[in-house]
Structures are given as structure tokens and as C-alpha cells.
Amino acid sequence: MTEVEARIQLEPSWKAKVGDWLLCSQMQELSAFLRQRKAVGARVFPPGPQIFAAFDATPFDQVKVVILGQDPYHGEGQAHGLCFSVLPGVPVPPSLLNIYKEIQDDLGIARPDHGYLMPWARQGVLLLNAVLTVEQGRAGAHQNKGWEGFTDHVVETLNREREGLVFLLWGSYAQSKGRVIDQARHRVFKAPHPSPLSAHRGFLGCQHFSKTNAHLQRRGISPIDWSLPPRNELDTTSAGA
């Protein structure tokens, strides 16, 4: 068992489906890389117990929607294991502000006073980054080190073993990762990334949130409540907050 396997435990339903990847040579190489970076003083985010937080929050059989991100936020205290999300009290990042703007325009839901998306995850929205770690101040520092193999395996397993999921693919990176998705089995919505650099090219106005709920309701599945409680009412259990 590698150090990472010993320290981080996958949620049981996910471990049964994709835990085999933790035993492969890619994981051993990734574990060695993470140890080496920490040995030279690199600050790795998110903290170890939160690396697999997306899986803890949304068990395999409870997934309704998948939002694919790229890699974690690289600022102090930002990343906590859910793509696009930050802990309560951390300033809302620009991409998430645009997500909130689209939700408001699409559904009339007012922007919340925080960037904590755990309530979505607990309803079945898997907030999955392609790369699960990063280093302070170095965006993309852990790309092409092995995480992509694991998260590809996650997407492929969902594609194969579930049916009727909604995949929200924002930006070329997410859309490339989502090429394996069988659109006869699942609903895929694509748009530019919500970053301020690209949101105006088609993310704003995409109506993905209402379209997602319409798809779920057509299948007899309860829709996602995209509203978020105010910060002073949040349940931050297991969030590291």
C-alpha cells in the first residue's frame, strides 16, 4: 500500500468501482511525485484529507450531474476538493461569480454570499476536477503527473455503468475529457468556460441549469436546487471549514 492509499480513503461506493486504479503503476508514480514535492517544501493543495472530497460528498449511485473542472485553485485556503468551490469566508473566484450570474439569469436565483458548493454535491452534483492536486501559486503544477488517468477512469466508469446522467462540459479542456461519453445514454451540455476571458462567448446565456433540471424531471428524477443557503446557515460538516 502506498502512502497516498494509506492516508486517503475513497468513499466505499467509489472504491468498489474505481479503487483498482489506486493499485496501478500510475498511482505509485503519482504518490512518489507528491512525496518528492512535499520533501522540497512545496505547498500542495487541497489538504490530504480533502483530495477526494468530491467522491465523499457524492457517492457513485447518487450522481445525477457531473461538472468537470481542470485543476484546483492554487491560492491559500481556496481548494477543498470540489471543482469551482471554495470554503465559506474565502472570496468567490471570478469563474464562480459568472456561474452565479448565469444561474441568476437562467433561474432567477440571487447570488449567494459565499462560494461553497457542497449543497450541490450532496444533491448529486459530482464536482470533479481532472487533476486533484496543485501547488501554491502554480496553476497546473500537477498536470500530466497521473491524476488524469484516474479521473478518466471515473468518467469512463460513470459513462458505462450509469444511465441518464447530465454532463456539463465548460471549455475545451472539459469537452476533450468528455469525448468518451455516450450521448445516447447521457445528456451532454457544452459551453465555453465561465472564466472572465471566455464567459461572454457563450457560457452566459447557456441556460445549462434549467436544461439540466428539465432533463432530470423528464426521467422522473428530482431536480437540483441550484440555490445555496446564506453563509450563516451552511452545514460545513466534513468540509474542513
Curated annotation (Swiss-Prot):
Catalyzed reaction equations: Hydrolyzes single-stranded DNA or mismatched double-stranded DNA and polynucleotides, releasing free uracil
Catalytic site positions: 71
Pfam family, one: UDG
SUPFAM superfamilies: Uracil-DNA glycosylase-like
GO cellular component, one term: cytoplasm
Subcellular location: Cytoplasm
An individual GO BP term: base-excision repair, AP site formation via deaminated base removal
GO MF terms, alphabetically ordered: uracil DNA N-glycosylase activity
Functional summary from the UniProt entry: Excises uracil residues from the DNA which can arise as a result of misincorporation of dUMP residues by DNA polymerase or due to deamination of cytosine.
Name this polypeptide is given: Uracil-DNA glycosylase
Source organism of this protein record: Xanthomonas oryzae pv. oryzae (strain KACC10331 / KXO85)
